[in-house]
């Protein structure tokens, strides 16, 4: 019985060690300036991949990473971006207000406003709990 259990355990370990999966995606939107990509592959318990994105300062950050039985390791690089920045769009002309603004309620008299007397609901003390 023990031999069957050990043999079954070995077959499961071999089957899980040969599992392979991978994925990748990318986004390139020049109107918003969103440029990023990622690729990752997994073989058994070992994962390795890379992702990159365009940062707000105009550089491209690239991270190469690997994870496995020896731990997680990442290498980060910052390179100048080869993608031109989105152009600044200006309005063709300024907007002129056709009339001066006046309040529909008239001018308020701020001299009538004053601070109201206020009493604390609980007396203040210097005792701290």
Curated annotation (Swiss-Prot):
Q: Which InterPro entries match?
A: CHIT_BIND_RR_consensus, Insect_cuticle, Insect_Cuticle_Struc_Prot
Alphabetized, the UniProt keywords read: Cuticle, Signal
Q: Where is the signal peptide?
A: 1-17
Q: Which residues form the Chitin-binding type R&R domain?
A: 18-90
Disulfide bonds, paired cysteine numbers:
none
Which body tissues produce this protein? Expressed in larval wing disc, forewing disc, diapausing wing, adult wing, and in very low amounts in fat body and testes.
PROSITE patterns attached here? CHIT_BIND_RR_1, CHIT_BIND_RR_2
Molecular function per GO: structural constituent of cuticle
Highest rank taxon of the organism: Eukaryota
GO cellular component terms, semicolon-separated: extracellular matrix; extracellular space
The entry's function note states: Component of the rigid cuticle of the larva and pupa of Hyalophora cecropia.
Q: What is this protein called?
A: Larval/pupal rigid cuticle protein 66
């Amino acid at each position: 019985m023990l031999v069957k259990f050990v043999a079954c355990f070995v077959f499961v370990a071999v089957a899980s060690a040969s599992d392979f999966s991978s994925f990748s995606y990318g986004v390139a939107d020049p109107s918003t300036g969103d440029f990023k990509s990622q690729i990752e592959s997994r073989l058994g318990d070992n994962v390795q991949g890379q992702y990159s994105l365009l940062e707000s300062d105009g550089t491209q950050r690239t991270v190469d990473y690997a994870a496995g039985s020896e731990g997680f390791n990442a290498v980060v690089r910052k390179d100048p971006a080869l993608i031109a920045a989105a152009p600044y769009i200006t309005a063709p002309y300024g907007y002129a207000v056709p009339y001066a603004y006046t309040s529909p309620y008239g001018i308020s008299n701020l001299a009538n406003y004053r601070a109201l007397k206020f009493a604390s609901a609980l007396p203040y003390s210097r005792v701290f709990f």
